[in-house]
């Protein structure tokens, strides 16, 4: 684990403005350095306010940006539960390339879906310029959950960038299998940021960081493996 810096804000709106500014800086720096930016983007509801601030930035050349969901539900690409669908709706009109983790021929086989996603990701240039993570109240990140798939998703085969997982227990709001970027893929990024809200999630994150590589919370396991500075954006 490298340096961790906390950025604290009174409101989610203030946090979103700062986070969007930092994401924009990473994008512009990556475009200047190697002609394009590759960003892994968290699902969930917290990123929505950041998306608005990002889209208001008229300086970003989205035609040179590739967006990859950190994870996705094993549903059709136009399903309301699809992270790809949200990114496509928001950013494809700006010219960004959106990479899907889901192959609709494998919706009934999460392990095959993970293999196909891994093949697709191999076509990208690695490492990613930025991994933008959220976190669940149980400490899960992307679709790396506590439970039977934790070790395989966090520290599985080093050559795998994506795997299929079956959360146990299934989340009540989206009881479906998932495909997720692996801990190896996430930890290899040039920059990492975590964006969370609320006192409960802050307590979970601080506890997981303190537990280090032995943590049973996915976020703790992942942070212990990251070798670049981590920026944590938090608001009440």
Identify the function of each model-found stretch.
Residues 53-62, 85-89, 146-156, 211:
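A glycine- and small-aliphatic-rich helix-loop capping segment at beta-alpha/alpha-beta transitions
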Residues 58-66, 153-156, 184-189, 223-227:
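Short, conserved loop/helix-junction motifs that constitute active-site signature segments
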Residues 1-39:
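N-terminal glycine-/serine-/threonine-rich phosphate-binding loop
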Residues 137-183:
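Class I SAM-dependent methyltransferase SAM-binding "motif I" and its flanking Rossmann-like core
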Residues 1-3, 62-132:
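Ligand-binding beta-strand-loop-alpha-helix segment within the catalytic cores
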Residues 28, 32-56:
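Glycine-rich N-terminal segment of FAD-binding domains in flavoprotein oxidoreductases
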Residues 181-184, 188-236:
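ATP/nucleoside-binding phosphotransfer catalytic cores, i.e., glycine-rich phosphate-binding loops
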Residues 41-46, 133-137, 197:
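Glycine-rich beta-strand-to-loop/alpha-helix junction loops that act as flexible
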């Amino acid at each position: 684990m490298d340096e961790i810096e906390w950025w604290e804000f009174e409101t989610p709106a203030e946090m979103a403005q700062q986070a969007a500014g930092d994401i924009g800086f990473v994008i512009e720096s990556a475009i200047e350095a190697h002609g394009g930016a590759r960003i892994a983007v968290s699902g969930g509801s917290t990123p929505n306010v950041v998306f608005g601030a990002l889209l208001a930035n008229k300086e970003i050349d989205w035609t040179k940006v590739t967006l990859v969901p950190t994870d996705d539900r094993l549903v059709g690409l136009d399903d309301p539960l699809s992270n790809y669908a949200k990114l496509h709706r928001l950013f494809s009109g700006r010219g960004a390339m959106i990479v899907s983790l889901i192959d609709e021929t494998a919706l009934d086989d999460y392990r095959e879906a993970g293999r196909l996603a891994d093949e697709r990701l191999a076509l990208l240039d690695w490492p990613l310029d930025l991994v933008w993570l959220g976190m669940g109240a149980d400490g899960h990140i992307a679709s790396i959950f506590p439970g039977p798939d934790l070790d395989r998703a966090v520290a599985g085969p080093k050559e795998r960038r994506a795997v299929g997982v079956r959360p146990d227990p299934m989340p009540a709001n989206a009881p479906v299998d998932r495909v997720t970027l692996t801990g190896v893929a996430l930890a290899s990024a040039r920059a990492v940021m975590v964006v969370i809200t609320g006192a409960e999630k802050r307590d979970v994150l601080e506890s997981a960081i303190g537990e280090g590589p032995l943590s049973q919370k996915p976020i703790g396991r992942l942070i212990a493996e990251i070798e670049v500075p981590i920026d944590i954006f938090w608001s009440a």
